[in-house]
Amino acid sequence: MVDNSEIRVVVGMSGGVDSSVSALLLKQQGFDVVGVFMKNWDDTDDSGVCTATEDYEDVKKVADEIGIPYYSINFEKDYWERVFEYFLNEYKKGRTPNPDVMCNKEIKFKSFLDFAMDLDADYIAMGHYAATKVDENGIVHMMRPKDGNKDQTYFLSQLSQDQLKKVIFPLANLTKPQVREIAIDAGLATAKKKDSTGICFIGERNFKKFLSEFLPAQSGKMVTPDGKVVGEHAGLMYYTIGQRSGLGLGSTKESTDPWFVVGKDLKKNELIVEQGYDSKLLYATSLDASGVSFFTGQPEHDIDLKCTAKFRYRQPDVGVTMHYHAKDNTVHVEFDEPARAVTPGQAIVFYNGEECLGGATIDRAYQNEKQLQLV
């Protein structure tokens, strides 16, 4: 029988309740646990308060309560070069990126994993809601966790088999309320701390104001699909496909329906808008995606697979047929039913029942083979 005390698990602790409970559970299971706080961003807020300092204080309190050593590591340079510059470049292209997917791939499961290995770790863990299963060949499969509402496999969709083999998910079989209860029963300092929301480097700040500090905005016309000017936009990067709020457009003689963003024309710097939730221009029948990553490894041959997918977080699965092209590591995905507001830059993640297969980045969307003018 394996003695857990000889297995070192380095836990990425954010100062939140989920990673705190992960560390606690691993300690209770007898592992040699080390806590590490990652500082990925200089996150002084508009009032001059650095939330990372507060979070690290919480990590220290919890580590002392559990009885584990702790460290702090600064990944700001890695984060800027591998996540934030990617984020800005995607917005420059008129796309809507998902920095959390890239942060997991490049920082939490690469930079942090490397650092943990330098601490002689056998495994790493964090506070993610996800699960794994090892097959008879030793291949690790990514599985949905017990708490479907907190399922974070979408954000982990770019991890490799090598990364997955080094990860433990202590919260796999717990719901969020159960995690809170464990923290309260153990008297952890973070037991009642509210969850962080939004993109980590923006925090509670105004997104438009934040983005304008790094990218110059270029205002332009808001037009209908047939070219009628109906308003002015503040800069294409501030809008995403399917967006309703913040357009500043009222009802017309023809309709009282709200307006939605249905496309962008980068060459003309025009934002294309149309009235009605069910605008035909919002519905795609297929898409192209690139940078495909499968948890069990990249196939050497083309694959056609009937499965389900999500193209945004917490969205119900939709039926798809995936056509994988091994030569250029891309997929063409056909939807069983037209899909609303497919957004270039976002992740599409594939599932087969309870297993998460992997994901890719959406490049283009089509309606009956005609490319939608989403970017």
UniProtKB/Swiss-Prot annotation:
It is found in: Cytoplasm. One of its GO terms (molecular function) is tRNA-uridine 2-sulfurtransferase activity. Its EC number is 2.8.1.13. It catalyses: S-sulfanyl-L-cysteinyl-[protein] + uridine(34) in tRNA + AH2 + ATP = 2-thiouridine(34) in tRNA + L-cysteinyl-[protein] + A + AMP + diphosphate + H(+). The keyword Cell membrane does not apply. It comes from the Bacteria. Catalyzes the 2-thiolation of uridine at the wobble position (U34) of tRNA, leading to the formation of s(2)U34. This is tRNA-specific 2-thiouridylase MnmA. The gene is mnmA.
